[in-house]
């Protein structure tokens, strides 16, 4: 066995999961707390993710129903600063970019969508969730979605903070973050439906 093969085998064995899978699937109960905070009226955030909704109602990514609301709705609407913004394309690959919230600008797959809502002047913190919306000042998850989730990245103020791939340990699904080298589990305790191994 040559040195390159030995290194590849060691690297594979040292990973904290058994296999990469094509996707994790939720049924409207599960969610993942990405442990990435956003400061309202301050941060610039990009989220790139590949999602296939399995039901036509439910929202995902992150937000709250108070002063701040940012997410994607399966019924063809964006949620941004409390306002629903219709969109016309049936996206599966989501590329969201939100400028500091004082600018009230949301870009989706390169298209600008403006909200008519006016955000408050205060700076609140928000958590980014996948499969659900997070709330202001660490409020509980809400608006859970039914979807198939594959890779996802989160960039905050120009820095890559999460780079997720769906994996399994035994028959339990996780998102593995290549940035922090950590497994992120379903916070509900229900567990994800696993896609096939890659």
What do these predicted ranges mean?
Residues 116-148:
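Flexible glycan-contacting loops in extracellular carbohydrate-active proteins
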Residues 157, 163-190, 198:
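Extracellular glycan/ECM-engagement signal in secreted proteins
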Residues 1-21, 180-198:
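Enriched but not universal
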Residues 88-111, 155-157:
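Localized edge beta-strand/strand-to-loop motifs within extracellular or lumenal beta-rich domains
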């Amino acid at each position: 066995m040559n040195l390159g093969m030995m290194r590849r085998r060691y690297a594979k064995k040292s990973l904290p999961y058994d296999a990469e899978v094509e996707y994790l699937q939720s049924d409207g109960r599960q969610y993942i707390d990405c442990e990435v905070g956003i400061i309202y009226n301050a941060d610039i955030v990009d989220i790139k993710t590949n999602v296939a909704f399995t039901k036509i109602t439910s929202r995902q990514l992150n937000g709250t129903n108070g002063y701040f609301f940012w997410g994607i709705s399966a019924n063809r609407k964006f949620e941004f600063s409390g306002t629903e913004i219709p969109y016309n394309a049936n996206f599966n690959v989501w590329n969201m970019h939100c400028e500091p919230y004082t600018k009230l600008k949301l870009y989706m797959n390169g298209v600008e969508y403006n909200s008519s809502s006016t955000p408050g002047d205060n700076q609140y913190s928000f958590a980014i969730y996948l499969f659900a919306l997070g709330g202001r000042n660490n409020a509980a998850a809400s608006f859970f979605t039914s979807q198939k989730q594959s890779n996802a990245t989160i960039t905050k103020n120009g820095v890559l903070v999460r780079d997720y791939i769906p994996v399994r340990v035994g028959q339990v699904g996780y998102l593995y973050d290549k940035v922090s080298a950590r497994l992120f589990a379903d916070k509900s305790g229900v567990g994800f439906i696993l896609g096939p191994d890659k």
